[in-house]
Amino acid sequence: MEMTLYSSSSFSLPSAPSNPSLSLFTSSFRFSSFKTSPFSKCRIRASLAVEQQTQQNKTALIRIGTRGSPLALAQAHETRDKLMASHTELAEEGAIQIVIIKTTGDKILSQPLADIGGKGLFTKEIDEALINGDIDIAVHSMKDVPTYLPEETILPCNLPREDVRDAFISLSAASLADLPAGSVIGTASLRRKSQILHRYPSLTVQDNFRGNVQTRLRKLSEGVVKATLLALAGLKRLNMTENVTSTLSIDDMLPAVAQGAIGIACRSNDDKMAEYLASLNHEETRLAISCERAFLTTLDGSCRTPIAGYASRDKDGNCLFRGLVASPDGTRVLETSRIGSYTYEDMMKIGKDAGEELLSRAGPGFFNS
């Protein structure tokens, strides 16, 4: 397991990262076709250049485990900032450390995610570090978290959810509808691929368009593809929304289950960490994610099956859920919706019922194709 330890007490150092494997994350901001605000550049560089702990005899109260991408680090720092603001003892220098852990999904970039196989491609190594006591809490993008957690861990906290919509980014077109027939769109998401091809069958999708946000924008600027779709939540957290050409509505592109949500896990027997995390939990987000994951669990979805699901609170305070399954080529798309009270019991039932309906409608073999 590859881990790199940083202190998170300082967030203002502009020096280059000491880890050579992270150099891409700073250099990839230099292409001219896309914009990054000065604040964003400073924040990302600071995220990657956090100072080494200066007091060797000081033991961190919390070690945060995370992936090493700029977005993952932004999420880890958001978690750190909220912990520091909520608990005075955590605001002291050296009280919180960030540990970067390289996952299977980070190591294998030459294949589509669906071809790698298995679940937890971006979480397994971090969860193992948590179970082994190498870290105290694990910060995950909830869309990457398998529906079944390791027995030794719990996930008691979801931070407030960001915008769930997808962003369209292109140098030559204002929207998907404006792309000429045969245009190539880059995405590593089967969910996006299937919905794009369902609505715009004349387009071509390159489905091994992988890498962090900066890498994908660089590939786009180099002309590898004509357009790409990225989660708006990630662009907002990186302060890179100036690169967005247009934003797709929920009707045009139903988001991934738990898109835009951050989940924080700890060991199931660590009452202190559970208490810290409970103080950060955003209950409305937690309920929505629970509903969506109940839907996903019922479908037993994997990286090979395009699945989308979104639970939100409507103007009357009710839960409105929309779910979708599709064939990878977009020729078959099945959708459903539910409405009910915004309570844990009802929302879990909504997700489960919606999943069972689509399982029945899809028929045998649909999820194995």
From Swiss-Prot:
Pathway: Porphyrin-containing compound metabolism; protoporphyrin-IX biosynthesis; coproporphyrinogen-III from 5-aminolevulinate: step 2/4; Porphyrin-containing compound metabolism; chlorophyll biosynthesis. Binds 1 dipyrromethane group covalently. It is found in: Plastid, Chloroplast. Its main location: plastid. Keywords: Chlorophyll biosynthesis, Chloroplast, Plastid, Porphyrin biosynthesis, Transferase, Transit peptide. GO terms for molecular function: hydroxymethylbilane synthase activity. It catalyses: 4 porphobilinogen + H2O = hydroxymethylbilane + 4 NH4(+). Its EC number is 2.5.1.61. PROSITE patterns: PORPHOBILINOGEN_DEAM. It comes from the Eukaryota. GO terms for biological process: chlorophyll biosynthetic process; protoporphyrinogen IX biosynthetic process. Residues 1-46 form a transit peptide. It holds the Pfam family Porphobil_deamC. InterPro entries: HemC, Porphobilin_deaminase_cofac_BS, Porphobilin_deaminase_N, Porphobilinogen_deaminase_C, Porphobilinogen_deaminase_C_sf. Gene3D superfamilies: Periplasmic binding protein-like II, Porphobilinogen deaminase, C-terminal domain. Its cofactor is dipyrromethane. The modification S-(dipyrrolylmethanemethyl)cysteine is found at residue 303. The porphobilinogen subunits are added to the dipyrromethane group. Tetrapolymerization of the monopyrrole PBG into the hydroxymethylbilane pre-uroporphyrinogen in several discrete steps. Belongs to the HMBS family. This is Porphobilinogen deaminase, chloroplastic. The gene is HEMC.
